């Protein structure tokens, strides 16, 4: 499954990298470039939907249209390395044979403007659910928190090889403008989504968030390895998390007043 909007520069590499799949579903969110024509060259199914804040809201629907039990979900700015594709193909039966396994994680390498990130909350040795069983894995319409294993199921992980080549390349952001615009869009629903999944915060936590979130990204998760880029990304992360927590706190206050 893949969801896209005006991604003609990124789509070819992404779709070519999943050429080993036999049932590709592409959903377009109103692209005005050549995205749909590109998708027609690779995808067996194409859908058109109105724009939404995040792709989870589309995947919730489309996952039910897929013919296979095991499904790959990938973003237009992601590319499956040939080494990873070969490993998935060769180990597919082994990886999916256990009845309690609902999802398989793969090594996930972030890039900012084609620069490999070695630290921050995004970079370093990251992992992502990539191949999942649609009967054992949940796709809920919740920004950042909608994709998770169903109760009683576990995951398995494809380990990073010595050459660090068997990765899902994530060409995450190609400009600061796109980076800021996307995260502003995510913030629209971040507070209410956190509230709906049971997350709660306090005024004290909101006040301390800038310090703790910057420290976590820049020092704990080694954002300093990325130099000035790591500093600015960590500062942005601190702002984003603080904004999301403040939104959540305001919603909590509103709900408390309504309950009186």
Which stretches of residues belong to each language-model region?
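Conserved donor nucleotide-binding strand/loop of the catalytic core
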Residues: 36-65, 94
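Catalytic-site signature of metal-activated, phosphate-bearing donor transferases
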Residues: 56-63, 70, 82-254
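Short, well-ordered alpha-helix to beta-strand connector turns
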Residues: 21-22, 43, 68
């Amino acid at each position: 499954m893949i969801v896209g909007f005006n991604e003609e520069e990124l789509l070819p590499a992404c779709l070519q990298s999943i050429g080993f799949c036999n049932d590709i579903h592409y959903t377009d969110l109103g692209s005005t470039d050549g995205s749909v024509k590109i998708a027609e060259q690779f995808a067996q199914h194409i859908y058109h939907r109105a724009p939404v804040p995040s792709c989870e809201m589309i995947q919730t629907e489309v996952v039910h249209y897929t013919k296979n039990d095991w499904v790959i979900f990938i973003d237009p700015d992601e590319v499956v390395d040939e080494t990873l594709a070969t490993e998935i193909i060769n180990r597919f039966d082994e990886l999916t044979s256990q009845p309690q396994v609902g999802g398989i994680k793969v090594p996930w390498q972030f890039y900012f403007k084609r620069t490999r990130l070695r630290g921050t909350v995004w970079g370093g040795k990251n992992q992502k659910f990539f191949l999942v069983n649609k009967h054992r894995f949940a796709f809920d319409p919740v920004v950042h928190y909608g994709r998770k294993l169903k109760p009683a199921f576990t995951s398995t992980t494809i380990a990073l090889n010595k050459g660090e080549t068997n990765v899902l390349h994530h060409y995450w952001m190609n400009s600061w403008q796109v980076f800021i615009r996307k995260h502003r869009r995510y913030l629209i629903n971040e507070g209410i989504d956190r509230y709906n999944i049971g997350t709660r915060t306090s005024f004290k936590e909101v006040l301390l968030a800038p310090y703790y979130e910057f420290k976590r990204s820049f020092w704990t998760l080694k954002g300093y390895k990325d130099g000035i880029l790591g500093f600015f990304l960590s500062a942005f992360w601190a702002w984003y998390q603080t904004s999301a927590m403040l939104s959540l706190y305001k919603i909590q206050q509103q709900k408390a007043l309504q309950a009186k």
